[in-house]
Amino acid sequence: MSRIAKAAGVALGTGAVVLSGTGMAMADAGAAGAAVGSPGVLSGNVVQVPVHVPVNLCGNTIDVIGLLNPAFGNACENGDDDDKSGGYGG
């Protein structure tokens, strides 16, 4: 087998392995765990902390907490969607 065919096979196999592990993670925004039946305050084993990470979607870039912002200088807005027109352009 030639080197190019081996390299293509390895690249295809690696891509298949990487893409097979991707998926969507979904979670609730609030933490509502409970240690039911535990005899004391410190005897439960439930620790939950709600985490809120701001994600900025601007044009065709996505930033998490604005680190190394590729959209520097673009006008973007983070806010509620108050316009309920339901369509594009007005």
UniProtKB/Swiss-Prot annotation:
The keyword Signal applies. Coiled coil: none annotated. Keywords: Amyloid, Cell adhesion, Cell wall, Disulfide bond, Secreted, Signal. The small chaplin mixture (a cell wall extract of an rdlA-rdlB knockout) forms a stable coat on a number of surfaces (including Teflon and cotton) and emulsifies oil-water mixtures, which could be useful in medical and technical applications. GO terms for biological process: cell adhesion. It comes from Streptomyces coelicolor (strain ATCC BAA-471 / A3(2) / M145). This is Chaplin-G. InterPro entries: ChpA-H. Residues 1-27 form the signal peptide. The gene is chpG.
